[in-house]
Amino acid sequence: MWGLILTVGAVIVVALFPAVRCAVTHPLHVLWYGVLDSFTYLRHKDYNCCHTGDLDIYCGYFGSGKTLSLVHKVTGLYERYDGKTVWCPRRGKFVTQRVLILSNVALAVPYQELRSLAQVVAASKVTQAYDDEHDTLTVTIACVDELGVQLNSRSFRDNIDPTFLSTLLCCRHYYISLYGSAQRFGHVDKLMRDVTLNVIQCRKIWRLQCNSWYDAWELENVTNPELVRPLRRGCWFVRNKDYRAYNTLAVVDTLTKRFEEKDMLSEAEILAARAPAAPTPDAVTNKSRKARKITRNK
């Protein structure tokens, strides 16, 4: 009896899940490449490689911990991966991994001040020559606090051109990641929203930093994040060293200086750059329980 139940269950699983069906029908390939990839992973020390290709924006109002979460992510990558020995597939040898942070907020770890998005494009062009000379592999992390407001500066946002967008779309190949923060995802420039991967909604309770990860495209189609089911949730405990890891006064001073220099866009230009689209909840596939209830009651 139990054998029949298990057999029927296995057939249902194979029928419903293409990945399981593919693995079951290619047992020798799964075994061979499983061993081969595991050996390569250990031999090339891939566990030391810093993950790149992220285009994430942390969102939340004042006191929600969006900048705290942004800095926690960026400094965590530096502390974990900088100086590690990694395999460079282009040169076919082991080199030292170098984590280069471009940030407009003062950090407790080494960083270069981010004055313009052109620096991100420049990093994709000059780091290879630097790496060849110093036997390194540079990972570039762009950290942009108050991204929505920063893009209101002409000198900062004028670099959002096809070259910059192409760099972002191929950022994994250039070993680049971009992390930003904004009060609301809709406050960010439309061109940036179109290439964003994840939106992280932040909520802080005492020293408990609770964050929810959303697909950026699905969040683009609703006005209320509660209508979308999070991809995942996480929480971490905030320590004193996390508060000391950054200073946002540099961001405020830079914005004040740009305003005094009349470098900011007009209100009409700001609203046009945001290009708010009409919400299309029907385009959301990962609806929350609240959204499904609203749909049923229509």
What does each model-identified segment do?
Residues 98-99, 138-141, 174-180:
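Loop/turn-to-beta-strand initiation segments
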Residues 212-298:
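Conserved P-loop NTPase motor module
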Residues 106-170:
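Conserved nucleotide-sensing/catalytic segment adjacent to the nucleotide-binding pocket
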Residues 45-53, 80-81, 85-86, 90-94:
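Phosphate-binding P-loop
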Residues 13-48:
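N-terminal pre-Walker A segment at the start of P-loop NTPase domains
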Residues 1-8:
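Feature marks short, highly hydrophobic, charge-poor N-terminal signal-anchor/signal peptide-like helices
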Residues 51-83:
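Glycine-rich P-loop/Walker A and Walker A-like loops and their local beta1-loop-alpha1 context
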